[in-house]
Regions:
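Long extracytoplasmic/lumenal interhelical loops at the membrane interface
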Residues: 112-128, 139-190, 213-220
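Hydrophobic transmembrane alpha-helices and their immediate junctions
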Residues: 189-238, 262-263, 268
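A membrane-periplasm/extracellular boundary helix in multi-pass inner-membrane enzymes
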Residues: 50, 54-59, 78-118, 128-135, ...
Length: 275
């Protein structure tokens, strides 16, 4: 029996993981040692990146589109020719538009319609409930505390009557809805102390990777060329995770705990190297 559930089966989680891995794939294409960089490695890495970019399209995950946009902005920092990068990214985006399915456009269009989208409306209500819950329970309610929530909100509902579309505002009651945000997930389950520790864990990792990137970027020794780019790749992956985590409850996602572990390992290696 093979358990194929790697905890990334949900569409938004899968899209976030895929986009977060792209900077690390790029690093392996340039600095890998198991498969030294050559034409075949670059071709395989390029195909893998293309597959990662297709995942948000196939899953129609709005979070994936946001993560792609964030990755595009982050990579501006490290590219040598920013103008060429912007032109190439724009050209690829324009060429891809005709191949996207109509359902993808319809799904992405809901990004700007919070009031009419039930998913977005539910998230806002859950977040509001979590803030109230944390005010009464500052130490949190433990795992799955969201199962105790219940709220009523107003939502436009469109239905066909007599051959015409009629939109009415209806009261919708919901209960036991998930947090749809790792920040609120930590707040509701672990309280303010847990949220602060979780934020500190990621903030310290980002700051440490930035410190390593700056200290190692100008080194010229052949054995000192991979540390700075790896710190940058891990930093980008962490930022993309935090962006994706803003819209889904993946605070305990193992993939990103592994990412934290890689940051700790790199930091320890660099500290010993310089000591």
């Amino acid at each position: 029996f093979v358990n194929d559930n790697s905890n990334i089966y949900e569409s938004s989680t899968l899209a976030t993981v895929a986009i977060a891995l792209i900077p690390i794939i790029l690093w392996f294409m340039r600095h890998g040692t198991i498969f030294p960089p050559d034409r075949r490695v670059r071709a395989f890495g390029g195909a893998l990146i293309f597959a990662c970019l297709l995942i948000p399209v196939g899953t129609e995950a709005r979070t994936g589109l946001v993560c792609i946009a964030v990755l595009g902005l982050l990579m501006l920092r490290d590219v040598k020719n920013r103008m060429m990068y912007l032109l190439a990214a724009g050209a690829v985006g324009v060429m891809a538009l005709p191949f996207l399915p109509a359902s993808y456009y319809e799904r992405m269009a809901t990004l700007g319609s919070v009031e009419s989208d039930q998913s977005a409306s539910t998230r806002m209500q859950v977040w509001s409930w979590t803030l109230d819950y944390a005010a009464e329970n500052p130490l949190g309610g433990g795992f799955d505390a969201y199962r105790g929530n219940e709220f009523t909100y107003r939502l436009p509902v469109t239905r066909e009557e007599g051959g015409a579309l009629v939109t009415e505002i209806e009261n919708v009651t919901d209960s036991g809805r998930a947090y749809h945000s790792s920040f609120f997930e930590m707040l509701g389950e672990q309280g303010w102390p847990g949220l602060i520790m979780w934020l500190a864990l990621h903030a310290l990792g980002l700051l440490q990777m930035e410190r390593i990137r700056r200290r190692w970027r100008d080194r010229e020794a052949p054995a000192e060329q991979w540390q700075g780019p790896l710190a940058s790749a891990l930093q980008f992956a962490n930022i993309i995770y935090l962006v994706g985590a803003s819209f889904q409850g993946i605070a305990y996602q193992p993939v990103f705990l592994m990412l934290i572990g890689l940051q700790i390992a790199l930091s320890t290696y660099c500290a010993k190297h310089d000591s």
